[in-house]
């Protein structure tokens, strides 16, 4: 009887030890898998970070190179045109009296003369292979002051100026696009040339200077970054 009891206890202890052994082995396997999963995720995140850093550097280099090219081409003309080039390569025409009559969308003669000189040279630079492949949009933006005659509400002022700024931007686009000197670029321009009216959404410190036209280059960097961010969602840590 005692012998049978001892055998039963021995079997039970052996069973318990086997259970602990299985638990230990399972835990080790789970830990190893978790470590491997973590290693893979960290590697993917590192690759994503390197890709984003590369895009940011390429964008910064491209922006600087384009800025230097624009400044070299138009540096002597900016004062004559009362224009400026911002660090983001926005070219701003600042003199409202030269651009349009108050409340009118028609491009004035003096501004047409400026565009005749400016736009073909501008497009020629942007169409260079080192810039063209990175350009998402060439955008003409119309901006206004916060004034709208006979307006009694913010809504009336904003919507009136939105309509006017859009009409002005479109008139500038139409004039530029109809220049015969850019005929060889038109197929490309159809894909990237845009006109936007922003009303007084982006005012300058001087309300009169807020009445302006800007030429902006939008690169593909943002789209590339968004693609990478979408991919990164698959590797978020749980």
Predicted feature residues:
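Short terminal targeting/anchoring segments
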Residues: 1-64
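Functionally critical alpha/beta secondary-structure elements and their flanking flexible loops
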Residues: 66-78
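Short edge beta-strands and adjacent turn/loop segments
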Residues: 77-93, 136-138, 144-146
């Amino acid at each position: 009887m005692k012998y049978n009891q001892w055998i039963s206890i021995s079997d039970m202890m052996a069973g318990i030890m086997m259970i602990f052994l299985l638990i230990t082995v399972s835990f080790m396997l789970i830990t190893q898998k978790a470590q491997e999963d973590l290693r893979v995720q960290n590697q993917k995140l590192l690759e994503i970070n390197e890709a984003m850093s590369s895009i940011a550097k390429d964008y910064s280099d491209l922006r600087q190179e384009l800025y230097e090219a624009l400044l070299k081409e138009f540096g002597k003309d900016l004062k004559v045109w009362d224009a400026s080039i911002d660090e983001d390569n926005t070219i701003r025409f600042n003199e409202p009296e030269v651009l349009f009559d108050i409340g009118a969308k028609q491009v004035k003669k003096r501004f047409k003369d400026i565009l005749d000189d400016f736009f073909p040279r501008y497009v020629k630079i942007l169409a260079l292979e080192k810039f063209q492949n990175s350009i998402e949009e060439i955008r003409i933006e119309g901006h206004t002051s916060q004034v709208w005659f006979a307006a009694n509400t913010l809504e009336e002022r904003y919507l009136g100026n939105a309509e006017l700024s859009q009409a002005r931007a479109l008139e500038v686009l139409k004039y530029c696009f109809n220049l015969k000197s850019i005929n060889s670029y038109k197929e490309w321009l159809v894909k990237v040339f845009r006109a936007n009216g922003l009303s007084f959404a982006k005012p300058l410190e001087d309300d009169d200077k807020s009445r302006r036209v800007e030429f902006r280059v939008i690169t593909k960097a943002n789209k590339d970054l968004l693609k990478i961010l979408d991919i990164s969602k698959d590797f978020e840590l749980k």
